[in-house]
A protein has these predicted regions:
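Fe-S ferredoxin-like electron-transfer domains
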Residues: 26-171
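Basic polycationic patches enriched in arginine
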Residues: 17-18
Length: 171
């Protein structure tokens, strides 16, 4: 996953560096040593994955992204079969983002690829992160929607199937 310099992506890339933190928030410098398979980095990734799965629905068999989902791949690599979290999962309704795009809030991991794509291509805010913390979701900017002819590209950018195509949903 690559993005513009200085842009952080989803927190599923924890590595051990001289200064601990998410790998995507720092640039690799000459002579820098990065340990991606150290015990500390693996433990950090396990923790991040557990948090990402707390409210993520277990609907992989019917998800349009099934078999091509980064989160599904990480979960299988991890060998995770259950969760320590016993509370009911939060349920949020599906939102219509306009055009052919639906937003399945429960699947979103807030990687912000869609937000950054729309900012870069449209040159003004169309999508944004609404709320904070565990209530954060992707939302539409005021008086904006995804009606531009190329806006449906955000569906392909979404790594977990949170953005789906109305005409091709569940097909």
């Amino acid at each position: 996953m690559q993005g513009p310099p200085g842009v952080g992506l989803a927190d599923d890339h924890a590595v051990l560096r001289r200064v601990d933190g998410p790998a995507q928030c720092g640039l690799v410098g000459e002579g820098q040593v990065v340990h991606v398979h150290s015990a500390k980095a693996l433990e950090a990734r396990k923790g991040v994955l557990e948090f990402l799965l707390i409210n993520h629905p277990l609907d992989c068999p019917i998800c349009d992204q099934a078999g091509e989902c980064g989160l599904q791949d990480y979960t299988f690599q991890e060998g995770r079969v259950d969760s320590r979290y016993r509370e009911p999962k939060r349920f949020n309704p599906v939102e219509d983002f306009g055009g052919d795009v639906l937003y399945v809030t429960n699947r979103c991991i807030l990687c912000t690829r869609c937000v950054r794509f729309m900012d870069d291509v449209h040159q003004e805010p169309v999508l944004c992160v609404s709320e904070r913390g565990d209530r954060a979701t992707i939302g539409k900017a005021a008086d904006a929607d995804l009606t531009q002819p190329w806006a449906a590209n955000v569906i392909d950018l979404c790594p977990v199937g949170a953005l789906t195509s109305k005409p091709f949903r569940y097909s």
